[in-house]
Curated annotation (Swiss-Prot):
Pfam families, sorted: PAPS_reduct
The keyword Iron is assigned to this record: yes
Keywords from the named record: Cytoplasm, Iron, Iron-sulfur, Metal-binding, Oxidoreductase
Family, per entry: Belongs to the PAPS reductase family. CysH subfamily.
Cofactor comment text: Binds 1 [4Fe-4S] cluster per subunit.
Name of the protein in question: Adenosine 5'-phosphosulfate reductase
GO cellular component entries: cytoplasm
């Protein structure tokens, strides 16, 4: 088994000559390699809808973890319910932070997402994912190379130093248009905020719509240097 500790570069290759541009091959390999010791960390963005559809074909009872920060858009929570109805056998786990919003405010002040967004992300996203990955050998992410400069070198299989795990990224070669083409072709549910200028959807407090021609992640932590929540730092 390929693990963080036994990591070797390029030990496996995947065919990209199909509708999924390698994603189906990558997921077949991941579930064969790790069986029930791999989890998909899903934010329920539009890429997530594609991955959930393909994962459901490969492993209908796969584990899916949603990092519920308690400050997501209502539309996101409603989408999760639609996904549960569409893929009833998937094991969707809503992972909560250790601190409630009230407890966080007492310790660190009100609106931590404004005063210290990095700490807020650590408390409400990074630490919960760390706890989820303790019992896993690998995790799956919907990163695409096209999304940003920080993601353009992502590979199908990555040694993840942040979580000391294997990070599997099946959608690295997909474009934004290809993601949407797949969603429409398979009549997949998606967050309606995508239709009103939100290409990337995170927490309600830190996500704004993006104007025409803007980068897909310009709406995340707008006005701050921060562009990533910290889950994908290498």
């Amino acid at each position: 088994m390929l693990t963080y500790e036994t990591w070797e570069e390029n030990v496996v290759s995947f065919s990209e000559e199909d509708e999924t541009k390698g994603a189906l091959s990558v997921l077949n390999w991941a579930y064969k390699e790790y069986k029930d010791e791999v989890v998909y960390a899903c934010s329920f963005g539009v890429e997530g809808m594609v991955l959930l559809h393909i994962i459901n074909q490969v492993n209908p009872s796969a584990k899916v973890v949603f990092l519920d920060t308690n400050v997501h858009f209502q539309e996101t929570y409603e989408l999760i319910q639609k996904v549960r109805e569409r893929f009833p056998s998937l094991n969707i786990i809503e992972k909560q932070p250790e601190l409630t919003l009230d407890e966080q405010a007492k310790l660190h002040g009100e609106k931590l997402w404004e005063s210290n967004p990095n700490l807020c992300c650590k408390i409400r996203k990074i630490l919960p994912l760390e706890k989820s990955l303790v019992v896993e050998k690998a995790w799956i992410s919907g990163l695409r190379r096209e999304q940003s400069e920080t993601r353009k070198h992502t590979k199908f299989i990555n040694q993840d130093h942040r979580f000391q795990s294997i990070k599997v990224c099946p959608l690295i070669h997909w474009t934004w248009k290809e993601v949407w083409r797949y969603v429409y072709k398979h009549s997949l549910p998606y967050n309606p905020l995508h239709d009103v200028g939100y290409p990337s959807i995170g927490c309600e407090k830190c996500t704004l719509p993006v104007g025409d021609g803007g980068d897909s992640r310009d709406g995340r932590w707008a006005g701050k240097v921060k562009t990533e929540c910290g889950l994908h730092y290498q």
